[in-house]
């Protein structure tokens, strides 16, 4: 992420703070996004994860990301940050 978006700030969110909040928040220029990282597309979602990903996607950009969709999600993130 730091190579794709020079100067961005990436924070790892504390799962104990708000249950279901996405794992990463990325701040880039005047934009932000969140990513919920999964080891695979089949990994089980925890309580509230879908709610927060959907809600934050309405506000800005948020996705579940895993090895199977990594390239697609990063391309979408790049488009969101450039729009």
Where are the model-predicted features located?
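Catalytic phosphate/metal-binding cores of nucleic-acid and nucleotide-processing enzymes, i.e., regions
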Residues: 1-83
């Amino acid at each position: 992420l730091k190579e794709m978006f020079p100067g961005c700030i990436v924070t790892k969110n504390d799962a104990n703070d708000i249950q279901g909040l996405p794992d990463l928040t990325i701040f880039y220029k005047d934009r932000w996004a969140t990513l919920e990282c999964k080891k695979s597309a089949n990994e089980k979602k925890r309580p509230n994860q879908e709610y927060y990903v959907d809600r934050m996607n309405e506000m800005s950009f948020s996705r579940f990301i895993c090895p199977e969709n990594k390239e697609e999600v990063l391309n979408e993130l790049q488009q969101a940050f450039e729009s």
